[in-house]
């Protein structure tokens, strides 16, 4: 069914992919991505695992006394950062899988 050495080859490939995925997980954990809103007036930097590292708010926004607008800008910056992190994760995953499309909803074990 697998041919001569086929099963051993398959197991070796699976082990190599597992090692590459572990390395990618380590890289993602170290990665930092910054999202912005309000033309850069609010910036949020997160890790690949979506932990917030830094929030930067332009001082002029603090003088406006418009809490709702500031809250919206913070939420938008966070969402932008998450989107960027997901794009980078997807690109790294494509490197490992050789561009092979994974099923929708497939989650990495991290």
From Swiss-Prot:
Keyword Calcium: no
The protein's role, per its UniProt record: Binds to DNA and alters its conformation. May be involved in regulation of gene expression, nucleoid organization and DNA protection.
Pfam families according to UniProt: YbaB_DNA_bd
Coiled-coil stretches: none
Family: Belongs to the YbaB/EbfC family.
Subunit comment: Homodimer.
The species this protein was found in: Tolumonas auensis (strain DSM 9187 / NBRC 110442 / TA 4)
Any GO CC annotation of this UniProt entry: bacterial nucleoid
Keyword terms of this UniProt record: Cytoplasm, DNA-binding
Localization: Cytoplasm, Nucleoid
Record-given protein name: Nucleoid-associated protein Tola_2216
Gene3D superfamilies hit by this protein: Nucleoid-associated protein YbaB-like domain (3.30.1310.10)
One MF annotation (Gene Ontology) recorded for this entry: DNA binding
Predominant localisation class: cytoplasm
